[in-house]
């Protein structure tokens, strides 16, 4: 028999006039290799079919199951219960995003708005002919672009960001990472001055306080620390 876990889950439906924010406590018997995602499924299947949380892939790829796990933004599907020695686990929705219900938040609209704000697409003067082979680039450059493209938009870096909590319009590490991704892509013809117009202010790269919680919590281990520093140096050199 496994040990008994105490799971405290935040419950609240902002669309309901009678719902009030509160914690609901559940006792779950731990199983080998149990994840928080498995725990939440057990709770929903056994105790609370009304519990809301998001998931798709269950493999750390889609980023849907981001939530606060004992105060740390993490993916439920990649967090093992055995890592919590006292067996007490508190789950809350990610801050900085609109709450849908319980542990479910709207990251989609935020990331869509961020993508539009930083103009997250290739800017080129000539029209691309899709019938021709794509222009070749050096393998090292392609690998660097791919590395930054691994962002799964889970929202963990945004939830961990002190600046984002204080400044609603801050683009966050995800936005700054997206800018660097296009900055190093040789297919994009924008200049440093063009990027400065997008993120050269306190809601962009100069709002970052370099606390680097984003770097610490990123489930894909993206090089956020070095890329934000690179972007800051680039933007400082513009003026």
Swiss-Prot record:
Domain of life: Bacteria
A biological process term (GO) from this entry: respiratory electron transport chain
Boundaries of every 2Fe-2S ferredoxin-type domain copy: 5-95
Enzyme superclass (EC): oxidoreductase
Keyword Magnesium in record: no
List of residues binding [2Fe-2S] cluster: 57, 62, 65, 77
4Fe-4S ferredoxin-type domain span: 142-171
GO molecular function, one term: 4 iron, 4 sulfur cluster binding
Chain positions recorded as [3Fe-4S] cluster binding sites: 161, 208, 214
Keyword Transport: yes
Chief location bin: membrane
Binding annotation for [4Fe-4S] cluster: 151, 154, 157, 218
Catalysis: reaction(s): a menaquinone + succinate = a menaquinol + fumarate
Its job: The fumarate reductase enzyme complex is required for fumarate respiration using formate or sulfide as electron donor.
Family, as annotated: Belongs to the succinate dehydrogenase/fumarate reductase iron-sulfur protein family.
Name of the protein described by the UniProt record: Fumarate reductase iron-sulfur subunit
